[in-house]
């Protein structure tokens, strides 16, 4: 019987994944830590108040850039997800009871850090009657109440696609409602067995119909083809998705889905251009782009592309929106030059 380091019996899919060693990364997957004044101030505030962000706890490679923009991400609902996706490092199982004071604490953390834009994400809570809908909505309400000049992006699970639960979340009116599709139909069931491709598209559609700015993410390198990625992008756009991020899959451990290929920066540039061609208001694509990467700036870019004005209380998000982010594929091409094909191999 195969077991994990903590003594837990491995799932069959984990045992199969573990047969493939962790892969060596290509040269373009790297970051440079630049500690500017805003980053240093945020780090001091976070440490002084004993606060915790996903940015730190997940060891995000983009923390220096996002914190310099006064942006951060918070994980809500506990540290245990009621579903398991084959790419995700969050543990799955039966979650702890809901902490109803969490929304207030998160809002106070946002105020203490002095964020300009905050992303809220969290685990799936199928164990709760409302699947956590109240929690996701209440965090947005509390942040807006205590931080009227802070934008909020709400990255949520699908709430089983139930209109009444989604309505609860929509009515909190985040600046951006995000739900990540993540992959293409052919491999969706293996990668996200507890989710449904069409249901995720319908979540985006319902948010669009409510009048929210919508966002999603695609992870590449798990076995999809170029044509399948383009088709998924069209599906998202047809569902009413406004903003899209496209990223490279990085394997959290050998128990997770093996990396099928390293997507070159040139291909990410192609997806960015294709996304704009088919009508996305904002597209960010690159190997180390993540769904919350430079989220405030991407929101501001999307509002501008739609020919709209940022709300008066969020005008500050429009500063420097035309600058290229360091993890965008076009920046990597300028820095490293054309990419050679890099086969996937053990490190």
Curated annotation (Swiss-Prot):
Name the EC number(s).
2.8.1.8
Cite the entry's keywords alphabetically.
Answer: 4Fe-4S, Cytoplasm, Iron, Iron-sulfur, Metal-binding, S-adenosyl-L-methionine, Transferase
Enzymatic reactions = [[Fe-S] cluster scaffold protein carrying a second [4Fe-4S](2+) cluster] + N(6)-octanoyl-L-lysyl-[protein] + 2 oxidized [2Fe-2S]-[ferredoxin] + 2 S-adenosyl-L-methionine + 4 H(+) = [[Fe-S] cluster scaffold protein] + N(6)-[(R)-dihydrolipoyl]-L-lysyl-[protein] + 4 Fe(3+) + 2 hydrogen sulfide + 2 5'-deoxyadenosine + 2 L-methionine + 2 reduced [2Fe-2S]-[ferredoxin]
Pathway, per record:
Protein modification; protein lipoylation via endogenous pathway; protein N(6)-(lipoyl)lysine from octanoyl-[acyl-carrier-protein]: step 2/2
Where does it localize?
A: Cytoplasm
Q: Where does [4Fe-4S] cluster 2 bind?
A: 81, 85, 88
Predominant location: cytoplasm
GO CC, one annotated term:
cytoplasm
Q: How is the cofactor bound?
A: Binds 2 [4Fe-4S] clusters per subunit. One cluster is coordinated with 3 cysteines and an exchangeable S-adenosyl-L-methionine.
Radical SAM core domain segment(s): 67-281
Q: Name one GO molecular function term.
A: 4 iron, 4 sulfur cluster binding
The reply to whether Cell membrane figures as a keyword in the UniProt entry is no
Give the matching Gene3D superfamilies: Aldolase class I
Binding site residues for [4Fe-4S] cluster 1:
55, 60, 66, 292
Q: Which Pfam families does its entry note?
A: Radical_SAM (PF04055)
Top-level EC class: transferase
**Hey, which family's this protein in?**
Belongs to the radical SAM superfamily. Lipoyl synthase family.
What protein name is recorded for this chain?
A: Lipoyl synthase
Organism, by scientific name, is Corynebacterium kroppenstedtii (strain DSM 44385 / JCM 11950 / CIP 105744 / CCUG 35717)
């Amino acid at each position: 019987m195969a077991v994990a380091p903590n003594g837990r019996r491995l799932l069959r899919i984990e045992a199969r994944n573990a047969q493939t060693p962790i892969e060596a990364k290509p040269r373009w997957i790297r970051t440079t830590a630049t500690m500017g004044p805003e980053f240093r101030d945020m780090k001091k505030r976070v440490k002084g108040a004993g606060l915790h962000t996903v940015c730190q706890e997940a060891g995000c490679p983009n923390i220096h850039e996002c914190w310099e923009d006064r942006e951060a991400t918070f994980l809500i609902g506990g540290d245990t997800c009621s579903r398991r996706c084959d790419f995700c490092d969050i543990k799955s199982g039966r979650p702890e009871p809901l902490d109803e004071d969490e929304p207030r604490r998160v809002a106070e953390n946002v105020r203490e850090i002095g964020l300009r834009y905050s992303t809220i994400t969290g685990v799936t809570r199928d164990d709760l009657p409302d699947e956590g809908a109240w929690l996701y909505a209440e965090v947005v309400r509390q942040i807006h109440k205590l931080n009227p000049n802070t934008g909020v992006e709400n990255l949520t699970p699908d709430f089983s696609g139930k209109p009444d639960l989604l309505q609860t979340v929509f009515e909190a009116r985040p600046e951006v409602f995000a739900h990540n599709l993540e992959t293409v139909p052919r491999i969706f069931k293996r990668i996200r067995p507890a989710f449904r491709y069409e249901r995720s598209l319908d979540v985006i559609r319902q948010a669009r119909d409510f009048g929210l700015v919508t966002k999603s993410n695609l992870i590449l390198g798990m076995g999809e083809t170029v044509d399948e990625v383009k088709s998924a992008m069209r599906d998202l756009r047809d569902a009413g998705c406004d903003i899209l991020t496209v990223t490279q899959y990085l394997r959290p451990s050998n128990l997770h889905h093996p990396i099928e290929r390293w997507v070159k920066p040139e291909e990410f540039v192609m997806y960015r251009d294709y996304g704009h061609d088919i009508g996305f208001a904002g597209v960010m694509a690159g190997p180390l782009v993540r769904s919350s990467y430079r989220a405030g700036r991407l929101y501001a870019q999307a509002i501008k592309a739609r020919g709209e004005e940022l709300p008066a209380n969020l005008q500050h998000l429009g500063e420097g929106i035309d600058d290229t982010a360091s993890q965008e594929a076009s920046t990597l091409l300028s820095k490293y030059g054309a990419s050679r094909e890099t086969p996937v191999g053990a490190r």
